[in-house]
């Protein structure tokens, strides 16, 4: 299914446990809990631009082509190299400390991040 669209944060599961597992300080976890994230995805075949805007004006944007190594950036600004894949209609990426899958289900963008035995799920609703 096509990913292109603008999505607004709707719900999440296991936020605190996942962020603690990543090693984030309590004050950063608390501040992040109040973010209203807007995700914008532009897909042109195998080419993607994936941007997330956070409360306070911070924006993280990654450009990648399915199956090709690229340089990406974490929310904290750390740059790393990864090869993003498409598996069963899901965009799959390995970040430095966790594994993430993203898929469109109806009008929702479902992002699942896993570190060890902790899984974080963020659901966003398509608004455009």
UniProtKB/Swiss-Prot annotation:
GO terms for cellular component: cytosol; membrane; nucleus. It is a peripheral membrane protein. The modification N-acetylalanine is found at residue 2. PROSITE patterns: FABP (PS00214). It comes from the Eukaryota. GO terms for biological process: fatty acid transport; steroid metabolic process. It is found in: Cytoplasm; Membrane. Its main location: cytoplasm. Keywords: Acetylation, Cytoplasm, Lipid transport, Lipid-binding, Membrane, Transport. One of its GO terms (molecular function) is fatty acid binding. Predominantly expressed in ileum; also expressed in ovary. PANTHER family: FATTY ACID BINDING PROTEIN (PTHR11955). Belongs to the calycin superfamily. Fatty-acid binding protein (FABP) family. Binds to bile acids and is involved in enterohepatic bile acid metabolism. Required for efficient apical to basolateral transport of conjugated bile acids in ileal enterocytes. Stimulates gastric acid and pepsinogen secretion. Forms a beta-barrel structure that accommodates hydrophobic ligands in its interior. Can bind at least two ligands per molecule, however, the stoichiometry is debated. This is Gastrotropin. It comes from Rattus norvegicus. The gene is Fabp6.
